[in-house]
């Protein structure tokens, strides 16, 4: 994610960029079309790259190894101009070493996104890995059942190049050995950023460039607070150990030190006032309410999925009963 964010930030300073993941001789010839010019113009937002990087890093942390992730691309299309603005994750499973997309999950997520982003539409899909291969063709054919002429974006998180490791493709049909074969044609793209995206990407790039956050005001403030709290903890621990040792007779009493410790304790704010209790209980109630609402939302989502599956099963059984009624 660091490399992708830094490269995206660098690319936003220019007028545009083409794909950084070059297709070389290692690509299987049967999946790439040669001499084909792209039919659409693609504008890619950095938010999509950050989402894909975050998706891949989370799955790698969960699995303990690099894994391939799959998701959907959403945005706007006006004629031959396509703007990829956001993305969301997709579920998939492997059957006989072939990736199968969970279309039911996709339709659920699409409905949810339509409620929030009514102006955005499904444009294609993304995955991670090296150059395109036949397995990508297999997944692309499944996406073609959902939308006609989808885009295919591939990010290589393991690359060591300084260019943006992202390539965008479209599918074309070519006649090979007398048979119609689906191939990929690489598209050039530009990076389109909004002000909020530009600020966020610049912040991430600054944080990841040095690894210490020296250029981030927020990071410097948090580091200073952490150092102060750590020092306070060590000093309080030292005073507590001295008082315990004095009570146990391990060290002689020093009345001056004990008076200073006593005065320090009395400098602490009184936390037993009615106003503090009221504010404290209000904050606890707010936190508990937020957690409760999150649980309710999750439960509603689970119930919604259950109802959808029940309706699908009920419709299938109803069709079966009607078909049997035609023959008996």
Swiss-Prot record:
Molecular function in Gene Ontology: metallopeptidase activity
Print the keywords alphabetically: Cytoplasm, Nucleus, Signalosome
Show where the MPN domain sits. 42-175
* Subcellular location(s) of the protein: Cytoplasm; Nucleus
Pfam families from the xrefs?
A: JAB, MitMem_reg
Q: Which residues cross the membrane?
A: none
Q: Which Gene3D superfamilies match?
A: Cytidine Deaminase, domain 2 (3.40.140.10)
The cross-references to InterPro entries, in alphabetical order and at most eight, read:
EIF3F/CSN6-like_C, JAMM/MPN+_dom, MPN, MPN_CSN6
Q: Name one GO cellular component term.
A: cytoplasm
GO BP terms in the entry: protein deneddylation
Q: What is the protein's major site of localization?
A: cytoplasm
Subunit-level organization: Component of the CSN complex, composed of COPS1/GPS1, COPS2, COPS3, COPS4, COPS5, COPS6, COPS7 (COPS7A or COPS7B), COPS8 and COPS9. In the complex, it probably interacts directly with COPS2, COPS4, COPS5, COPS7 (COPS7A or COPS7B) and COPS9. Interacts with the translation initiation factor EIF3S6. Interacts weakly with RBX1. Directly interacts with COP1 and 14-3-3 protein sigma/SFN. Interacts with ERCC6.
Spell out the family assignment given in the record's similarity comment.
Belongs to the peptidase M67A family. CSN6 subfamily.
Function, as annotated = Component of the COP9 signalosome complex (CSN), a complex involved in various cellular and developmental processes. The CSN complex is an essential regulator of the ubiquitin (Ubl) conjugation pathway by mediating the deneddylation of the cullin subunits of SCF-type E3 ligase complexes, leading to decrease the Ubl ligase activity of SCF-type complexes such as SCF, CSA or DDB2. The complex is also involved in phosphorylation of p53/TP53, c-jun/JUN, IkappaBalpha/NFKBIA, ITPK1 and IRF8, possibly via its association with CK2 and PKD kinases.
What is the protein's name according to its record?
COP9 signalosome complex subunit 6
Species of origin reads Pongo abelii (Sumatran orangutan)
């Amino acid at each position: 994610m660091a490399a992708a964010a830094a490269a995206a930030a660098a690319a936003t300073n220019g007028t545009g960029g083409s794909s950084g993941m070059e297709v070389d001789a290692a690509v299987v010839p049967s999946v790439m079309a040669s001499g084909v010019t792209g039919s659409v113009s693609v504008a890619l937002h950095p938010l999509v790259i950050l989402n894909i990087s975050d998706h891949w890093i989370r799955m790698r942390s969960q699995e303990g190894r690099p894994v391939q992730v799959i998701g959907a691309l959403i945005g706007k299309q006006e004629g031959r101009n396509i703007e990829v603005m956001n993305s969301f994750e997709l579920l998939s499973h492997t059957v006989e070493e072939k990736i199968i997309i969970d279309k039911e999950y996709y339709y659920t997520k699409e409905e949810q996104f339509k409620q929030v982003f009514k102006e955005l539409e499904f444009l294609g899909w993304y995955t991670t890995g090296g150059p395109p291969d036949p397995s990508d063709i297999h997944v692309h054919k499944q996406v073609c059942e959902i939308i006609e002429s989808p885009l295919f974006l591939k990010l290589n998180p393991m690359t060591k190049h300084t260019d943006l490791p992202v390539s965008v493709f479209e599918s074309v049909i070519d006649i090979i050995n007398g048979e119609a074969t689906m191939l990929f044609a690489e598209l050039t793209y530009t990076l389109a950023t909004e002000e909020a995206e530009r600020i966020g990407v610049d912040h991430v790039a600054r944080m990841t460039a040095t690894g210490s956050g020296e250029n981030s005001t927020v990071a410097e403030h948090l580091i200073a607070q952490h150092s102060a709290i750590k020092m306070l903890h060590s000093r309080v621990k030292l005073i507590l150990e001295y008082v315990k040792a004095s009570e146990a007779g391990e060290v002689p009493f020093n009345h001056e030190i004990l008076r200073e410790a006593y005065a320090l304790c009395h400098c602490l704010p009184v936390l037993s006032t009615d106003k503090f209790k009221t504010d404290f209980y209000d904050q606890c109630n707010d936190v508990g309410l937020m957690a409760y609402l999150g649980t309710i939302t999750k439960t509603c989502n689970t119930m919604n999925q259950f109802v959808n599956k029940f309706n699908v099963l009920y419709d299938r059984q109803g069709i079966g009963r009607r078909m049997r009624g035609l023959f008996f």
